[in-house]
Amino acid sequence: GTIRVSGNTSLEGQLQLTESAAAAVHTTAINGVTSVSLNFGIAQNFFTSVTAAHTLARPTNARVGQVGSILLMQDGGSGTLAYNACWNFIGGETPTFSTANDAMDRLDYIVVSISTDNTAENIQAVMTQAYS
């Protein structure tokens, strides 16, 4: 059967999916603003078309251990992406967003630490690029 839960729900103990069970997290669109502050309390996966110079700010409502993906589509070849200091990449090298028209990049992340107001302090991230 189907179990539907709405509202804030907490599960304690171990959750195990068996047999042919699958889990999926809803993808949320990001509005085309200059400084993008993702609300990790409403989604784990996000999508946006990058149309101008954007900065990925410190996410709000983050939880330690939270993981997800941010799908980034290059709108016209001129969009750029900068990052708040909480975003940390392998070797300290900030990736450059793809510039080809309609290029799709994916930024995968895990929240390592948060501040007392639940904004992210340290996010480890890796970008894979140029999906077709």
Q: Where on the chain are the PLM-derived regions?
A:
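Extracellular beta-sheet repeat scaffolds used for adhesion and glycan interaction
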Residues: 88-94
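Beta-strand-rich interaction surfaces with strong enrichment in secreted/lumenal proteins
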Residues: 57-58, 94-98
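Exposed extracellular interaction/assembly regions and N-terminal maturation sites
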Residues: 12-88, 102-105, 112-132
